[in-house]
């Protein structure tokens, strides 16, 4: 099943001072988005995006359960001091890279 950017509307925004942690979270987002286009989940989370957003990144999933799995696995794998959840939304669709 393919997904489009508008399907990825279950978002979670996190803050981390460490770009390496952001890289780990990007990989974890792709791992947790088990169907559709998993790369959409971590769109707009590269270094320039992270810096521009004040060291915040937003991941967007196509299902609520994928976001829940992401939170569970991030907490299991990464020390809590390395990142913090700022917000979650169910109505925050991803946008293509050219927008």
PLM segments and residue spans:
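Short, flexible, solvent-exposed loop/turn segments with mixed acidic/basic and small polar residues
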Residues: 1-4, 41-52
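Short cationic amphipathic helices and targeting signals
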Residues: 12, 54-62
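Helix N-cap motif at beta-to-alpha junctions
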Residues: 17-18, 60-68
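Short amphipathic alpha-helix segments
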Residues: 18-44
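Conserved short beta-strand edge segments in small beta-sheet-based binding/regulatory domains
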Residues: 38-40, 78-92, 99
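Catalytic "initiation/cleavage/transfer" segments centered on a nucleophilic residue
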Residues: 67, 98-99
